[in-house]
From Swiss-Prot:
One of its GO terms (biological process) is 'de novo' IMP biosynthetic process. Coiled coil: none annotated. This is Phosphoribosylformylglycinamidine cyclo-ligase. It catalyses: 2-formamido-N(1)-(5-O-phospho-beta-D-ribosyl)acetamidine + ATP = 5-amino-1-(5-phospho-beta-D-ribosyl)imidazole + ADP + phosphate + H(+). The gene is purM. One of its GO terms (cellular component) is cytosol. It comes from Shewanella sp. (strain ANA-3). It is found in: Cytoplasm. Keywords: ATP-binding, Cytoplasm, Ligase, Nucleotide-binding, Purine biosynthesis.
Length: 345
């Protein structure tokens, strides 16, 4: 009987050395996001973070999200450096809705076979997203799971914790008829609706490299999600924000009602903005009904803010100074009976 060949973890498809190389590669990206509250360095069993001392009654706000099937397009077109920004954006934009300042972020990267170059690109993007939002990247998990994912395909999940003063939590309770609604422009479809995007590409047999408004269609589709944290923190400090809605999965119809009292509805002026070209392309090439567009995509609006009507001019000026494209998109009205909570005129 011959002696069996000794087996290693690498023989089973898990390369510990590759994982160590990744950790070494991302140290600079992590260091760039460090906040003064962070204790310790990357690599501990748990990451430590103090609460900022400026808060009297700090309330922690948590969120988790992914990038969805936008990843499929990114993998197919080898565009790995911006999906990390998407991942952070989907989490921190949810936190800012409550008025919370993001504190720290953790990521989960799962793959069948770890490609160090690809993973480094992804995590560097996560670091960029954290930098844009003032959030510390304090840890994560890289899971190499042969047999669970095909080849070098990967999936991402993000986890974020923020903090808000208890008295300053934004929960929509101050929203009232007569409030104005301000829209903040999106950078594209962000990270929602990509199963429909991919279906439109399939049925239309369109060339993703075709020109659309001066750049390839695929570039429009893979544009990273806009992060609104820093500009909205300044708006919250300077104005009287009653509510904010992050326009993600479910579009206008489902996200705006999440922050409205039962006796209020949002009346949106559909002619107050022009849809970016990518949404018109999707609608036309997929023969998608307008209602379905507003249900699936942000249609050019990444965030909606409710505030008193007399605060609009100052708010728009502040947002413009922060580099945001913002405009008056509608108003809050009294809701009667079982009326829908969102009306687009």
């Amino acid at each position: 009987m011959s002696t069996p060949t000794p087996l290693s973890y690498k023989d089973a498809g898990v390369d510990i050395d590759a994982g160590n190389a990744l950790v070494s590669n991302i140290k600079a990206a992590v260091k760039r996001t460090r906040r003064p509250e962070v204790m310790g360095n990357l690599g501990g069993f748990g990451a430590l973070c103090e609460l900022p001392t400026k808060y009297k009654q700090p309330v922690l706000v948590s969120g988790t999200d992914g990038v969805g099937t936008k990843l499929r397009l990114a993998i197919d077109y080898k565009k790995h450096d911006t999906v990390g920004i998407d991942l952070v954006a989907m989490c921190v934009n949810d936190l800012i809705v409550q008025g919370a300042e993001p504190l720290f972020f953790l990521d989960y990267y799962a793959t069948g076979k770890l490609d160090v170059e690809t993973a480094t690109s992804v995590v560097n993007g996560i670091g960029e997203g954290c930098f844009q939002s003032g959030c510390a990247l304090i840890g994560g998990e890289t899971a190499e799971m042969p047999g669970m994912y095909e080849g070098e395909d990967y999936d991402l999940a993000g986890f974020c914790v923020g903090v808000v003063e208890k008295a300053d939590i934004i929960d929509g309770s101050k929203v009232a008829a007569g409030d104005a609604l301000i829209a903040l422009a999106s950078s594209g479809p962000h990270s929602n609706g990509y199963s429909l995007v991919r279906k439109v590409l399939e049925v239309s047999q369109a060339d993703p490299q075709q020109d659309l408004n001066g750049k390839p269609l695929i570039q429009h589709l893979l544009e990273p999600t806009k992060i609104y944290v820093k500009s909205l923190l300044k708006l919250i400090e300077a104005s009287d924000v009653h509510a904010m809605a992050h326009i993600t999965g479910g579009g206008f119809w489902e996200n705006i009602p999440r922050v409205l009292p039962e006796n209020c509805k949002a009346v949106i002026q559909g002619d107050s903005w022009q849809w970016p070209a990518v949404f018109n392309w999707l609608m036309e090439n997929g023969n998608i009904a307008e209602y379905e567009m507003y249900r699936t995509f942000n249609c050019g609006v990444g965030m909606i803010v409710a505030l008193p009507a007399d605060k609009v001019d100052a708010a728009l000026a502040l947002l413009a100074a922060e580099g945001e494209q913002a405009w008056l998109i509608g108003a809050i009205a009294a809701r009667e009976g079982n009326e829908e909570q969102v009306e687009i005129l």
